[in-house]
Amino acid sequence: MATSDSEFNPDLLLAHKLPETRSTYNERDVAIYALGVGACGQDAVDSDELKFVYHENGQEHIQVLPTFVSLFSLGSLTHGLDLPGFKYDPSLLLHGQQYIEVYRPLPSKASGSLINKVSLAGLQDKGKAAILEIETRSYEQGSDELLCMNRTTGFLRGAGGFSNSYQPFSYKNYPSTQSLAALLYRLSGDYNPLHSDPNVAKLARFPRPILHGLCTLGFAIKAIIKCICKGDPSTVKTISGRFLATVFPGETLITEMWLQGLRVIYQTKVKERNKAVLSGYVDIRGLSSSL
């Protein structure tokens, strides 16, 4: 079980700054890496693989395997060994997952040092274990252009039990819609009379005009930004929503959300009818919530 020098403090953990690291590489490093992952291992003159090791016009023309950028995150999990208020046995650490985004092909030789900005992306209590996520974003020195991003996930055996619940961190939000919500939302451009004309609503077999599905989605995402993202909309990366049932203006929307790493799973229900009307997920760029 994880132990702490003091009571586990999520706010202190989230505010903790991990040190930047530097990386540099050349054509030799690129070729050795390619050979290490089996390039030309079956056929030394395989043109599909030789290009990662040799080029007739010079080594500066060899190509870089996309997974080469994973080297920039080496040691990122060990940064987690020094999280304030959270200690664990590093011998029980297992590399559980690696996620990589490459924004442009890398040259065979770095023009200078690469700056790796390292941050805590997630920490989950799994009872007998914990899951730690470290994000490494790599830039060319002196440039704001992001080259690649690694998200390294470690499985920490015996490190669980630090939170009050083994479930993903959960939140609820209870905003009420106004009776004129559909009339107001239609001014954003959706003028379907189903949402404003009682006669059209009756023809569609609804007792009264219904709320736009995208309006309900807006309520839900706003709730997630408030509860999970500490009010910062720039942390939202992707949004997915499935419309399950209709909402009538004036009903209260309860949005329940569960933080799982960098993904927020959510469900929105109508309080008055206890009926699920929307479900989906939101991917965020960093851990902005409280634990």
Language-model segments: residues:
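Preference for short coil/turn "hinge" residues that link or interrupt alpha-helices
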Residues: 18, 86-87, 93, 99, ...
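A conserved, well-ordered hydrophobic junction motif at loop->secondary-structure transitions
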Residues: 44-71, 178-231, 235
